[in-house]
């Protein structure tokens, strides 16, 4: 399966039990900041934004004072899982980032998708990639 198929079929799909509800944007990005696959709606990000995200995975809490920045948007960092999952909130939407052995899985959502639904979609694929050694 291509990386783009993972984004299209596992991240940008309808939320289970909620036909028509899906993430606004999603991507799989290597730890080095290279995009493996992304939805057409995923924001263009700056290298320093990706560096900040990687630093927060290695030093949990690094982004708490300044927020998580992606594609010029600022998210307030909320409770995640140290070294494994970063979650952010912005208005009625937010972001979930799951770190795997080689990649970062991004999901961005707006209402009516809930934070819990975004977490489920992103973390399910992230856990699968981890199990595959990716």
Swiss-Prot record:
Pfam families (alphabetical): Profilin (PF00235)
SUPFAM superfamilies referenced in this protein's UniProt entry, alphabetically: Profilin (actin-binding protein)
Species name: Olea europaea
Motif Involved in PIP2 interaction in this chain: 84-100
Function: Binds to actin and affects the structure of the cytoskeleton. At high concentrations, profilin prevents the polymerization of actin, whereas it enhances it at low concentrations.
Assigned GO CC terms: cell cortex; cytoskeleton
Modified residues (Phosphothreonine): 114
Protein name: Profilin-3
Disulfide bonds: 13-118
Family label: Belongs to the profilin family.
């Amino acid at each position: 399966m291509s990386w783009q198929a993972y984004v299209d079929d596992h991240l940008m799909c309808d939320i289970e039990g909620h036909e028509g509800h899906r993430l606004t944007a999603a991507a799989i990005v290597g730890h080095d900041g290279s995009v493996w696959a992304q939805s057409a709606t995923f924001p263009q990000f700056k290298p320093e934004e990706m560096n900040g995200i990687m630093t927060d995975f290695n030093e949990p809490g690094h982004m708490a004072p300044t927020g998580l920045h992606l594609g010029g948007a600022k998210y307030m960092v909320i409770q995640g899982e140290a070294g494994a999952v970063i979650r952010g909130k912005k208005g009625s939407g937010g972001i979930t980032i799951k770190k795997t052995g080689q990649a970062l899985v991004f999901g961005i959502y707006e209402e009516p998708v809930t934070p819990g639904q975004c977490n489920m979609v992103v973390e399910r694929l992230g856990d699968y990639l981890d199990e595959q050694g990716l």
